[in-house]
């Protein structure tokens, strides 16, 4: 089944924890950074265009990957899985890459690492968003961040600190509960938290993050499923539907509907 295929693919990735694409440095001597199923936008940045949603809106998802080891081609598993989801659910997915540190590619989760690495990360994401819109020839109606595993811990911090100008977050298999708003008047983008209840490593962290959002009176939704350390496609579908609903409702659209 399709649900099982994405689950198995991303579980494997976690455990290891525009013309034609050209090779990007860092993918290995004989491997480009971007897989055949996605397109290279710039060095270590890929994308897949799944087209508009069923109602014609253009959705951009910025995907913050789970831990990647430096083995050439290892990143392809997550790229391919999200590219399939983009086609199935009608969105464009942008794949930035975290900094390369001692043991692989990880997003910064400590305050010290964020202070050192975050300015370049955020600037790179903003450049890539603009370049992608130019490449495709259209702007996006809504932009959401999806963070998985290492990317979930970082995305949760970005959300609470309102560090990116986006319309919502989907945080899967992880979450940091220590971050606090830097500006009480900053935009509070809604957050969907998917708790992988069968993952002993992250379930408690995800629940704690949801508790932090509740204490902050943040717009959020939390859902638990008996799944392990993976990007569950049910979480992704539910989170995307909810965020799309929130965005349409915020625009006062009569067709917002309930997710």
Residue ranges and their predicted role:
Residues 20-60, 91, 121, 150-153, ...:
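A domain-start/cap signature at the N-terminus of enzymes
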Residues 57-60, 88-93, 139-142, 164-168, ...:
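Loop/turn elements at helix/coil->beta-strand transitions in domains of secreted/extracellular proteins
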Residues 168-244:
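The feature captures the conserved acid-bearing segment of alpha/beta-hydrolase catalytic domains
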């Amino acid at each position: 089944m399709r649900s099982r295929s994405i689950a198995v693919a991303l579980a494997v990735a976690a455990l290891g924890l525009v013309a034609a694409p050209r090779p990007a440095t860092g993918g290995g001597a004989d491997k480009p950074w971007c897989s055949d199923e996605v397109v290279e936008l710039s060095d270590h940045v890929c994308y897949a265009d799944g087209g508009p949603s069923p109602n014609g809106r253009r959705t951009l998802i910025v995907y913050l990957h789970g831990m990647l080891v430096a083995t050439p081609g290892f990143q392809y598993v997550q790229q391919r899985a999200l590219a399939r989801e983009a086609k199935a659910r009608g969105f464009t997915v942008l794949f930035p890459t975290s900094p390369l540190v001692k043991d692989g590619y990880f997003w910064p989760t400590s305050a010290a690492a964020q202070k050192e690495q975050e300015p370049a990360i955020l600037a790179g994401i903003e450049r890539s968003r603009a370049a992608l819109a130019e490449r495709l020839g259209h702007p996006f109606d809504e932009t959401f961040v999806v963070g998985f595993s290492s990317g979930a811990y970082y995305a949760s911090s970005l959300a609470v600190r309102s560090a990116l100008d986006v319309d919502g977050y989907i945080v899967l298999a992880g979450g940091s509960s220590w971050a606090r708003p830097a500006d009480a008047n900053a935009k509070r983008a809604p957050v969907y938290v998917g708790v992988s209840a069968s993952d002993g490593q992250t379930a408690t962290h995800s629940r704690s993050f949801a508790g932090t959002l509740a204490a902050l009176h943040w717009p959020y939704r939390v859902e638990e499923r008996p799944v392990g350390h993976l990007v569950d496609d049910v979480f992704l579908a539910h989170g995307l539907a909810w965020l799309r609903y929130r965005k349409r409702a915020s625009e006062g659209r009569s067709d917002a509907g309930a997710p």
